[in-house]
């Protein structure tokens, strides 16, 4: 049964998925969505429904709906029908149709009374009103919609149509869906209208409050026409905003220069006679006039200049006779016809360009010339072009197919019928393709194994290594193309030689002579439609020697097995690539070819060389022609402050027009207007609404403000809450609540009535709709399921997990109990409860309610309260309803269709508890003080009372003793006497009282008749008398008491007073006992808090103890590891480089030299000279890792050299052996690590040392051979030709000394095994270069810098980053390639980094790729940075200077030290082409500072002759034109006194953007100072005025730049000046990527050597050897050998063949059999073992495995990603080839 149920359920799910994914459902969904795209068509539809009444109104309604539906049907049909789609889906339909039609309706209908729009006769057809309504709704439905744009929906349709098979079904279903949505919408509109008409509550309760609003609804109904006209006007305005009207905008001038006037503006499209060859649109021939628009859009190849030049060839004499005698027109006859038709299209063309050109002049999206981009239009082209191509042997749609290739292939197919291929079955094609690839792979494998066998048989290196193929320019002269232009060397990234035509007049005779020797390729002939039958008679094969390809040093023959091509392919190949040589005697051919003319076409382009009004004011226009500013800037005026009338001589040499112009340098300021700037740098004529995004904050932000970088922003409290203000508001609200309570009661009564009415209305509306109850019921059921089983359990899990994280006990049981208690009861539509599972009958149609009993509310905690407390709560608050009804939105209501009630907040009890805790803390903190205060007051009162009682008793006893002593002279002893004394005292008191009363009575009897005043006086006198008597008596009693106190006992004397004291104490104690309860509670609470805090702190204390214990264990382990590492370092004596110079300890200082790269190059140079090589010895050397980075073991190398007889390490002979430079280069190129680009070579110290040694040894060594002297002559000749000064910093004597030192140092490096070493070499080098640099340029701290290992970056002054500007160029006379290295101020630090740093190793590898990143770093202060990664380098270097070497980190803006020394030289008469092309700034004074430059020579062959004279003329023309253009541009520019000024100006204007930040007060101060400066500059004696302005306070001295050496660094530290560089894209070639990738994965051990001053921790990781070392870690592996220095067998093949071999292996991975694939590759590996070691197996030898894997892995990884993905498949993600790498390499076991 269970299986059956699951089967049914699975079928239902699959059925539902099929229904959802079906075409009909998707079409319905799309159609339903289109109903929401409400456009202007709905205005007419709604007007017909609202306004028209009667019989004619119903007809109008019907016509409006039919027209509306018909228009929508046309839109849906246009999806399927392409012509209709092109007509309706273009944006110009809005411009042509919508706006005039809308405006016509608005102005036509606005003057009429819309409500009285009816006609007199019913069926009158002359009015055509019903037809107009139909047309309105039909036409307006075709317009683009604006509430929900239809473009989004159209894209959805196109996406689905692309993968949909049954397209017509999709269109019909979408139309049906739209129809359903439209019906629902119109029903809803009808219900709204009926509700407005029938609802009396609007007039009675809501709107009509007085007689004023009595007729509001009627007026609203009557003014519907006006409302619709207003809506129509708003629509017109909206479309006007979207459609830029070209009538009211200013038209800019377009550039219409022809391309033939300038040489550099020609595009290599001579072969293309039709514009359709290079355009993607493939227009018809009669649309050639519109091609200019397509070219402007950048879809073809556009060069860097602003004109576009198309060269086509055609024949004026188009009539030529065929063999049949018929006449035919040529293929370019249409030009003549088009010229005739142009006169009729004088109106059509501007109208078309006005309407349809979306990139017209009033669009602000044109490109503007700046310092980086100087093109009219960027070469932007879509990377997606769909075309069929073969992939994996099958025809597939490629989305990155070259469009030019596809058009060319289509043309060839049309012209040549043999190109049309028969379609083969896909299986046959794939098998054929796989067989070809398998054959290629086998051939490569054989060649690879043959080369390995040759290596094993110890052949010479020339026979083993495959050399690169170079393109030969001239075979007899053995001239090759330069490396940058050679397609075999550079592939896709190669350059393109532009052979520019000479300026010479070609006469008819010259043309006829030249035609005799001309030849035409057959491909050109096919495209030109020339008569082939005549040409085929004169076919001769191409002389292949003229285009021969020489393979240099290829010692292996081609594979014997060649592919057998079919006859058709051979014929096609011959037909295409044979050459037709014209015969001079054939007059027809001469006629055809002599009449070729060049057609130059003017292409209109909008000007892109625009300048702003601000630039025009500042005078920064580079051209002589005055230009109108094309960009609107803020309103400003140029105020000239100072004019320098001293003339500056401008000297230009070797030019046609030498002129000395005097210019007056003006110093001007720009004064802006105070009004706000609304121009925002907008282009003149463009629309303001369509401008680019404008900056609303600062133009250049010092810090990031985007939410994307929120984690990098300093965490600050952006919002501050006013707590006291909130408290005041709360208190004021509480006070006002009582007053508002009565008002609230009345409002509640009214609200309840309104709520009831609203519930009834909602219930009725749900009943009125057709499918409303179905939708509502399904939504309710889904909401109940979501609430019960998804949302609430998730909330429970989150809550309890948070409690566990906060170290609190979870409440799973309580929450689950409450959750299970919640019940969802299904009810009828009226609210009758049924059960949890039972649904009411017909609930989908009749409706349903869901009642929730005991709704679950998430609580932060559960309190265990007693039953009494619960009953108390119920009595106080009343019984709360434990049920609610569920709404469609998942909310809760008390009644069905009621308003949603608020749920009890989860965070409210938390906030209450927090408030309670805070209040308790406050009360407890002050409770102790209160108690102490109360106790203190009680104690003081008690003491006072005791004191008063004692005094009273004492006085009383004393008086009584006196009385007793008077009456009884007997000694008073015993209690009896005291008792008698007390009785006598009482009697006396009573007698006194009676006497007093009697006296008063007598007096009152006697003086009844007397006056009041006399009585008062008498009473006062009597009282005084009585008081006196009493005082006397008391004094007597005191005396008696003192006399008789000795007779009384002490115990009996204080019995009665002690009783009274006890009573007072008893009273006070009861009070204390009553208040002591609070004190006890306080103590108990404090104890409980302390215990609770202790329990909470237990896990924290335990974790802290755990971390501390682990930390101590780790510290001990690290300390032991460090000790072990130091011991191992002490034990090690292995030296990997043959030329590593030992650190020599002298008495004064320790100097160590590192010329590892020099000696390595020298050893390879020696090895390349071996004429009779014995590779049995070389094999032993290969085992010890020579071929990659040459870490030699000294003893074995020494023995090998002794046996070969190359040199002896004891014999100090300076004679060098003979060699060719090319062999040396080829040896280096065979190792791909040395085959780097020129920029990478220039950055390496290796290349520079090699160059210095070559140059200096050639000049000074007397024992050179003839060949070396020839090289010397070549170098000297080059110096004479280009007037190049090799080293202008040093004099000839210094050069002589330097050369001898280099020579000696080179010699010493070979004999580095000697124990003694001449320290004078190091001192001489140090003095020669370090001191030269430091003293020449006046750098402070010379003595400290010389002998430092780590140079402090704050000492030196460098303005630019360490980037070398290298411009490769070709010397046409010798065909040599030079690199002009422009050395700026910042580059001279190289001399310090080479020699001055003693222990710093100049290694081959880039230090983990950090060189490139630090060279490309920003020019800014690090306090204001965009990305904190750059800040890391600076901060780590400041703390630990050993992290980054000195040459890698030079900060940019440090203390400015002016260069005072200048070297003067005379201007030469001839400016070399090198200086013309590279130097940007000329120094026009007699004194100028030279910048040192370096030249790098690369000679390809020995005997190279001068090239042709045409190339020389071209080179001269280029030089002259370049010099003219540069000097013309510099005429209006500011001239500089030194190169430092020029560089600084270039830096500030071209390469950076700066920004000043200060407050308004500081700004005002500066402005006041500037105003004073403007006056002072003009005066001859400004002292008096300056002093007076200072006294008046106009000029403030605190902001003056008083310091002489005031630098930008201080301003940047303070944050006033912010300088950021312009972000430029850096283009890296593939070889540099290889170099950087290997540099990341392989880290040299010498990188981690440190000085004794800074000790570094070394960690050994034996388990993870393969891990790449990150940039910020230094990790050394303790091994006996360097595992990455070994011979890679794969380097036997050339890089091209190597890639081909790998790719063929990758293509073979389609078979899902990884075992076979690995076994094949393992076989290759086993064959390779013979190279590395014959005796040992590769699998067993762990070291060789690690070596093999560590080198092959980065090679494969890099080339797979960079070459295959990026350039071939146009993907940058490497996931596609991850499985290839997994299958390619097995995991080697590590023991």
Swiss-Prot record:
Membrane-spanning intervals of the chain: 19-39, 68-88, 91-111, 133-153, 176-196, 227-247
Keywords noted in UniProt: Chloroplast, Membrane, Plastid, Plastid inner membrane, Protein transport, Transmembrane, Transmembrane helix, Transport
A GO BP annotation: protein transport
Pfam families with a match to the protein in the record: Ycf1
Ranges where the record places region Disordered: 1492-1511
InterPro entries: TIC214
Subcellular location: Plastid, Chloroplast inner membrane
Membrane disposition: Multi-pass membrane protein
Family: Belongs to the TIC214 family.
Physiological role: Involved in protein precursor import into chloroplasts. May be part of an intermediate translocation complex acting as a protein-conducting channel at the inner envelope.
Assembly behavior: Part of the Tic complex.
Note: There is a partial copy of the N-terminus (positions 1-343) of ycf1 in the inverted repeat (BAF50158).
Protein's UniProt name: Protein TIC 214
Organism: Barbarea verna (Land cress)
Underlying gene: TIC214
């Amino acid at each position: 049964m269970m299986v059956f149920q699951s089967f049914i359920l699975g079928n239902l799910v699959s059925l539902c998925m099929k229904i959802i994914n079906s075409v009909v459902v998707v079409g319905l969904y799309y159609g339903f969505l289109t109903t929401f795209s409400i456009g202007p068509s709905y205005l007419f539809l709604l007007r017909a429904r609202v306004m028209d009444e009667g019989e004619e109104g119903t007809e109008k309604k019907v016509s409006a709906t039919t027209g509306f539906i018909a228009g929508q049907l046309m839109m849906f049909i246009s999806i399927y029908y392409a012509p209709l789609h092109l007509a309706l889906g273009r944006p110009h339909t809005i411009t042509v149709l919508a706006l005039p039609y809308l405006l016509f309706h608005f102005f036509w209908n606005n003057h009429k009374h819309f409500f009285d729009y009816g006609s007199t006769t019913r069926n009158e057809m002359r009015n055509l009103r019903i037809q107009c309504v139909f047309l309105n709704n039909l036409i307006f439905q075709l317009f683009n919609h604006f509430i929900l744009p239809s473009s989004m929906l159209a894209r959805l349709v196109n996406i689905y149509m692309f993968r949909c098979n049954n397209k017509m079904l999709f269109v019909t279903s979408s139309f049906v869906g739209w129809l359903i949505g439209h019906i629902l919408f119109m029903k809803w509109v009808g219900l709204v209208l009926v509700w407005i008409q029938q609802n009396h509550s609007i007039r009675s309760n809501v709107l009509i409050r007085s007689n004023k609003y009595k007729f509001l609804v009627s007026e609203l109904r009557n003014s519907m026409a006006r409302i619709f006209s207003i809506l129509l006007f708003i629509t017109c305005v909206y479309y006007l905003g979207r459609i830029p009207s070209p009538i009211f905008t200013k038209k800019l001038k377009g550039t219409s220069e022809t391309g033939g006037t300038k040489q550099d503006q020609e595009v290599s499209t001579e072969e293309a006679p039709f514009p359709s060859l290079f355009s993607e649109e493939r227009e018809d021939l009669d649309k050639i006039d519109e091609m200019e628009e397509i070219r402007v859009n950048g879809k073809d190849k556009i060069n860097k200049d602003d004109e576009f030049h198309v060269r086509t060839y055609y024949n004026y004499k188009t009539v030529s006779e065929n063999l049949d005698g018929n006449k035919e027109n040529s293929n370019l006859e249409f030009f003549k016809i088009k010229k005739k038709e142009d006169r009729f299209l004088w109106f059509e063309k501007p109208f078309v360009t006005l309407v349809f050109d979306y990139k017209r002049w009033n669009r602000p999206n044109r490109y503007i010339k700046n310092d980086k981009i100087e093109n009219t239009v960027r070469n932007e082209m879509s990377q997606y072009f769909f075309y069929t191509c073969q992939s994996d042997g099958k025809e597939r749609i490629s989305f990155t197919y070259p469009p030019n290739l596809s058009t060319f292939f289509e043309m060839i197919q049309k012209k040549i019928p043999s190109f049309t291929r028969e379609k083969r079955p896909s299986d046959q094609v794939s098998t054929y393709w796989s067989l070809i690839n398998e054959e290629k792979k086998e051939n490569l494998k054989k060649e690879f194994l043959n080369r390995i066998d040759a290596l094993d048989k110890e052949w010479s290196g020339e026979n083993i290594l495959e050399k690169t193929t170079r393109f030969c320019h001239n075979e007899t002269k053995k001239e090759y193309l330069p490396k940058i232009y050679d397609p075999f060397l550079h592939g896709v990234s190669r350059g393109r030689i532009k052979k520019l035509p000479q300026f010479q007049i070609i006469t008819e005779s010259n043309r006829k002579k030249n035609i005799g020797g001309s030849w035409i390729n057959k491909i050109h002939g096919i495209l030109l439609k020339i008569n082939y039958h005549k040409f085929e008679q004169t076919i001769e094969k191409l002389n292949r020697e003229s285009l021969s390809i020489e393979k240099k040093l290829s010692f292996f023959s081609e594979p014997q097995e060649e592919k057998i091509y079919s006859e058709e392919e051979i014929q096609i190949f011959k037909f295409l690539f044979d050459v037709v040589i014209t015969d001079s005697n054939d007059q027809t051919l001469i006629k055809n070819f002599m009449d070729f003319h060049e057609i130059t076409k003017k292409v209109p382009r909008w000007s892109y060389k625009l300048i702003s009004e601000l630039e025009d004011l500042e005078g920064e226009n580079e051209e002589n022609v005055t230009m109108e500013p094309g960009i609107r800037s803020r309103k400003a005026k140029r105020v000239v402050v100072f004019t320098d009338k001293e003339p500056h001589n401008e000297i230009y040499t070797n030019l046609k027009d030498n002129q000395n112009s005097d210019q007056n340098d003006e110093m001007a300021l720009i004064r802006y207007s105070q009004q706000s700037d609304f121009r925002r740098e907008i282009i003149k004529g463009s629309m303001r609404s369509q401008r680019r995004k404008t900056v609303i904050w600062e133009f250049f932000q010092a810090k990031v403000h985007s939410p994307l970088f929120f984690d990098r922003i300093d965490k600050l409290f952006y919002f501050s809450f006013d707590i006291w203000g909130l408290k005041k508001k709360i208190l004021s609200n509480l006070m006002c609540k009582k007053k508002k309570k009565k008002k609230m009661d009345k409002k509640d009564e009214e609200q309840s009535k309104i709520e009831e009415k609203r519930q009834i209305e909602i219930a009725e509306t749900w009943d009125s709709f057709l499918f409303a109850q179905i939708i509502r019921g399904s939504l309710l059921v889904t909401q109940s399921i979501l609430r019960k089983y998804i949302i609430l359990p998730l909330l429970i899990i989150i809550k309890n997990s948070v409690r566990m994280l906060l170290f609190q006990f979870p409440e799973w049981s309580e929450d689950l109990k409450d959750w299970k208690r919640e019940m969802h009861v299904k009810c009828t539509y009226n609210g009758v409860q049924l059960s949890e599972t039972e649904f009411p009958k017909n609930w989908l149609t009749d409706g349903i309610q869901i009642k929730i009993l005991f709704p679950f509310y998430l609580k932060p905690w559960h309190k265990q309260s007693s039953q009494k407390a619960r009953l108390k709560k119920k009595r106080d608050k009343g019984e709360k309803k434990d049920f609610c009804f569920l709404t469609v939105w998942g909310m809760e209501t008390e009644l069905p269709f009621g308003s949603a009630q608020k749920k009890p907040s989860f965070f409210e009890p938390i906030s209450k508890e927090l408030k309670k805790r805070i209040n308790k803390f406050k009360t407890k903190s002050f409770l102790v003080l209160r108690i102490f205060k109360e106790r203190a007051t009680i104690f003081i009162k008690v003491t006072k009372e005791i004191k008063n009682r004692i005094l009273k008793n004492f006085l009383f006893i004393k008086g009584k003793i006196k009385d007793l002593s008077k009456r009884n002279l007997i000694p008073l002893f015993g209690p009896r006497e005291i008792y008698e004394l007390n009785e006598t005292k009482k009697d006396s008191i009573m007698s006194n009282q009676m006497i007093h009363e009697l006296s008063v009575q007598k007096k009152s009897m006697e003086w009844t008749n007397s006056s009041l005043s006399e009585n008062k006086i008498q009473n006062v006198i009597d009282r005084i008398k009585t008081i006196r008597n009493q005082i006397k008596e008391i004094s007597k009693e005191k005396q008696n008491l003192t006399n008789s106190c000795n007779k009384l006992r002490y115990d009996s004397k204080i019995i009665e007073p002690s009783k009274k004291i006890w009573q007072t104490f008893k009273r006070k104690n009861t009070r204390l006992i009553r208040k002591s309860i609070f004190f006890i509670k306080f103590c108990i609470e404090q104890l409980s808090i302390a215990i609770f805090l202790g329990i909470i702190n237990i896990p924290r204390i335990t974790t802290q103890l755990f971390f501390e214990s682990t930390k101590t264990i780790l510290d001990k382990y690290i300390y032991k590891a460090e000790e072990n590492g130091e011991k191992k370092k002490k034990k090690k004596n292995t030296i990997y480089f043959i030329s590593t110079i030992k650190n020599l300890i002298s008495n004064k200082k320790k100097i160590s030299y590192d010329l590892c790269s020099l000696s390595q190059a020298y050893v390879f140079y020696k090895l390349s000279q071996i004429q009779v090589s014995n590779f049995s010895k070389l094999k032993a050397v290969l085992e010890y890792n020579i071929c990659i980075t040459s870490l030699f073991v000294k003893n074995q190398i020494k023995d090998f050299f002794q046996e070969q007889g190359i040199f002896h390490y004891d014999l100090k002979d300076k004679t060098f052996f003979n060699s060719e430079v090319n062999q040396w280069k080829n040896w280096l190129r065979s190792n791909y690590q040395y085959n780097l680009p020129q920029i990478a070579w220039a950055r390496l110290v290796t290349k520079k040392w090699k160059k210095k040694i070559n140059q200096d040894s050639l000049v000074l060594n007397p024992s050179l051979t003839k060949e070396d002297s020839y090289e010397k002559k070549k170098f000297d000749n080059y110096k004479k030709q280009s007037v190049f000064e090799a080293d202008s910093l040093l004099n000839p004597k210094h050069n002589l000394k330097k050369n001898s030192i280099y020579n000696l140092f080179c010699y010493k490096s070979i004999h580095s095994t000697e124990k003694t070493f001449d320290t004078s070499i190091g001192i001489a080098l140090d003095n020669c270069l370090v001191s030269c640099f430091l003293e020449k340029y006046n750098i402070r701290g010379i003595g400290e810098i010389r002998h430092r290992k780590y140079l402090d970056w704050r000492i030196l002054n460098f303005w630019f980053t360490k980037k070398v500007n290298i411009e490769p160029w070709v010397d046409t006379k010798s065909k040599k390639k030079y690199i002009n290295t422009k050395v700026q101020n910042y580059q001279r630090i190289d001399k310090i980094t080479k020699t001055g740093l003693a222990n710093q190793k100049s290694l081959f590898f880039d230090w983990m790729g950090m060189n490139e990143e630090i060279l490309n770093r920003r020019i800014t202060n690090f306090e204001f940075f965009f990305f904190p990664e750059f800040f890391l380098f600076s901060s780590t270097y400041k703390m630990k200077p050993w992290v980054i070497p000195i040459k890698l980190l030079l900060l940019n803006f440090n203390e400015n030290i002016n260069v005072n020394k200048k070297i003067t030289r005379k201007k030469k008469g001839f400016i070399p082409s090198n200086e013309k092309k590279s130097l940007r700034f000329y120094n026009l004074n007699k004194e100028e500072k030279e910048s040192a430059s370096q030249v790098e020579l690369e000679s390809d062959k020995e005997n190279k002759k001068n090239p042709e004279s045409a190339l020389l003329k071209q080179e001269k023309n280029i030089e002259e034109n370049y010099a003219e253009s540069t000097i013309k541009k510099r005429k209006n520019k500011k001239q500089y006194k030194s190169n430092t000024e020029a560089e600084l100006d270039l830096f500030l204007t071209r390469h950076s953007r700066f920004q000043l930040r200060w407050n308004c007060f500081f700004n005002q101060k500066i402005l006041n100072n500037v105003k004073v400066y403007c006056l002072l500059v003009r005066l001859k004696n400004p002292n008096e005025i300056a002093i007076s302005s200072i006294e008046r306070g106009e000029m403030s001295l605190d902001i003056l730049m008083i310091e002489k050496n005031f630098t930008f660094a201080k301003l940047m530290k303070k944050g006033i000046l912010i300088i950021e560089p312009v972000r430029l894209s850096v283009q890296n070639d593939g070889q540099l990527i290889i170099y950087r990738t290997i540099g990341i994965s392989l880290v040299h051990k010498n990188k981690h050597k440190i000085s004794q001053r800074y000790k570094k921790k070394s960690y050994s990781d034996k388990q993870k050897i393969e891990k790449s070392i990150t940039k910020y870690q230094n990790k050394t592996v303790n091994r006996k050998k360097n595992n990455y220095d070994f011979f890679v067998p794969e380097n036997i093949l050339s890089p091209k063949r190597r890639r081909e071999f790998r790719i063929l292996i990758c293509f073979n991975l389609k078979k899902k059999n990884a075992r076979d694939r690995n076994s094949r590759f393992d076989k290759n590996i086993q064959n390779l073992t013979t190279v590395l070691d014959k005796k040992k197996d590769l699998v067993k030898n762990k070291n060789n495995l690690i070596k093999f894997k560590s080198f092959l892995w980065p090679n494969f990884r890099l080339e797979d990603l960079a070459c295959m993905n990026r350039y071939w498949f146009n993907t940058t993600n490497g996931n596609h080839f991850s499985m290839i790498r997994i299958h390619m390499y097995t995991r080697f076991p590590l023991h």
